[in-house]
UniProtKB/Swiss-Prot annotation:
Lineage start: Eukaryota, Viridiplantae, Streptophyta, Embryophyta, Tracheophyta
PROSITE patterns tied to this protein: KH_TYPE_2, RIBOSOMAL_S3
Descriptive protein name: Small ribosomal subunit protein uS3c
Gene Ontology MF terms: rRNA binding; structural constituent of ribosome
Family, similarity comment: Belongs to the universal ribosomal protein uS3 family.
Native source species: Lotus japonicus (Lotus corniculatus var. japonicus)
Compartments in which it is found: Plastid, Chloroplast
Record's subunit section: Part of the 30S ribosomal subunit.
Keywords assigned: Chloroplast, Plastid, Ribonucleoprotein, Ribosomal protein, RNA-binding, rRNA-binding
Keyword field contains Cell inner membrane: no
PANTHER family: 30S/40S RIBOSOMAL PROTEIN S3, SMALL RIBOSOMAL SUBUNIT PROTEIN US3C
Coiled coil segments of this chain: none
Keyword Cell membrane belongs to the record: no
Major location category of this protein: plastid
Length: 218
């Protein structure tokens, strides 16, 4: 059987860059890794609590972390940054203070910046969130998948593949359903493919959503 490799790790250094940029001694490496996860979780929790959206999409594409001795630079790539900035102009400052408190930073400065993703539905994380929201609202999985593919096609992608696994529609036996539109060349390293794996809790149990988006060839 074919062994499935993570499409992002497979393309690191060619079309894909690292989300965490720092150097550490082997002894401190795990601590730095834990710290990165804590920062990301902290930001996601704050945004979940702060933003109440009808569609249920938070719109976080990815969170990049760059570390220096005295500074931690965090860049949040969002599909809908207005949701965080509108209404309260001081929200980013609030978020910064909140993360700084939880991480107990004394000698290090934390700086958070927000970058807007031009086409939100070209990002697999935002698309997976959209599908998860639809499934939570008991929309038929086929309808949710077709709508997601429609949105990515409008965003100007070359191909998209969506897969949902688990007890779909509450059926007793778990199964895998998938749909593909356009080309998704997973074995071509030059092909710029974005990928996301997302878990959603529904009333029937846990479902796994995977999204592959073929953007272009470099």
């Amino acid at each position: 059987m074919g062994q499935k490799i993570n499409p992002l790790g497979f393309r690191l250094g060619t079309t894909q860059s690292h989300d965490s940029i720092w150097f550490a001694q082997p002894t401190n490496y795990s601590e730095n890794l834990k710290e990165d996860k804590k920062i990301r979780d902290c930001i996601k929790t704050y945004i979940q609590k702060t933003i109440k959206i009808s569609s249920g999409v938070e719109g976080i594409g990815r969170i990049k972390i760059q570390k220096r001795i005295d500074l931690i630079q965090v860049i949040i790539y969002m599909g809908f940054p207005k949701l965080l900035i509108d209404g309260k102009p001081r929200r980013i400052e609030e978020l910064q203070i909140n993360v700084q408190k939880k991480m107990n930073y004394v000698n290090r400065k934390l700086n958070i910046a927000i970058t807007r993703i031009a086409n939100a539905y070209r990002d697999p994380n935002i698309l997976a969130e959209f599908i998860a929201g639809q499934l939570k609202n008991r929309v038929s999985f086929r309808k949710a998948m077709k709508k997601a593919i429609e949105l990515t096609e409008q965003a100007g992608t070359k191909g998209v593949q969506v897969q949902i696994a688990g007890r779909i529609d509450g059926k007793e036996i778990a199964r895998v359903e998938w749909i593909r539109e356009g080309r998704v060349p997973l074995q071509t390293i030059r092909a710029k493919i974005d990928y996301c794996s997302y878990t959603v809790r529904t009333i029937y149990g846990v479902l796994g959503i995977k999204v592959w988006i073929f953007l272009n060839k470099e």
